[in-house]
């Protein structure tokens, strides 16, 4: 699964990791199911997000607001996020963009952090 993350500027890694543990427990998804973290380009150098990715051992992939906004589908909108980033939702859109699949767990928010999970398409070959 791909983890989509949005966060306020200056959010510590600990806040992201704490919310992630709660989010995964609520969704009954193992941490081992995560393959990457995705967000918006504005967060490419966000220290707390980079540190959280380092602790998790996962790569961070970011996308421009235009690429996230172009994704079709129902996403949980936020006028505030739209005013700051230029796209109405970062976590869900980034997760879907990074996975190429469908939203598995919708936006979960607390203390300036938003998380979402999307499933990568899987087609076994025999």
Regions inferred by a protein language model and the residue ranges of each:
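Alpha-helical scaffold segments in soluble metabolic enzymes
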Residues: 19, 51, 92-96
């Amino acid at each position: 699964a791909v983890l989509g993350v949005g966060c306020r500027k200056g959010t510590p890694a600990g806040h992201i990791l704490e919310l992630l543990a709660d989010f995964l427990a609520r969704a009954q998804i193992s941490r081992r199911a995560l393959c990457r973290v995705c967000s918006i380009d504005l967060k490419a150098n966000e220290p707390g997000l980079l540190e959280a990715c380092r602790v998790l051992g996962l790569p961070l992939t970011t996308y421009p607001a235009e690429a996230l906004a172009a994704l079709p589908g129902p996403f949980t909108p936020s006028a505030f996020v739209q005013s700051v980033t230029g796209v109405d939702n970062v976590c869900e859109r980034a997760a879907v963009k990074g996975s190429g699949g469908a939203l598995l767990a919708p936006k979960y928010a607390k203390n300036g952090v938003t998380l979402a999970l999307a499933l990568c398409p899987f087609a076994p070959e025999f």
